[in-house]
Swiss-Prot record:
Natural source organism: Actinia equina (Beadlet anemone)
Major localisation: secreted
Propeptide residues according to the Swiss-Prot or TrEMBL record: 20-26
Compartment list: Secreted; Nematocyst
UniProt keyword annotation of Zinc-finger present: no
One example GO MF annotation: sodium channel regulator activity
Name of protein: Delta-actitoxin-Aeq2c
Length: 82
């Protein structure tokens, strides 16, 4: 079970870390709650995309053309929006 969890985490990490190379960048990744979406997820769309913090990104953890839109910064990832 632990191996499966590590494998799934590694696959998600690699998919999100390489997502900025894709043309359909907004369709890939994990949706997250932006401040503009409202106070809760109930009845609201999640308009942000979770980005893994990797080298080469700006100080906000988002790729070029995207901005930080979350309430607080994560340790491994940030919620970004185009």
């Amino acid at each position: 079970m632990n191996r499966l969890m590590i494998l799934v985490f590694a696959a998600v990490f690699l998919a999100l870390a390489s997502a900025d190379e894709d043309v359909d960048i907004a369709k890939r990744g994990i949706p997250c709650l932006c401040v503009s979406d409202g106070p809760s997820t109930r009845g609201n769309n999640l308009s942000g995309i979770m980005w893994m913090k990797t080298g080469g990104y700006g100080g906000n953890g988002c790729p070029k053309g995207w901005h930080f839109c979350g309430k607080s910064r994560g340790f491994f990832s940030d919620c970004c929006k185009r």
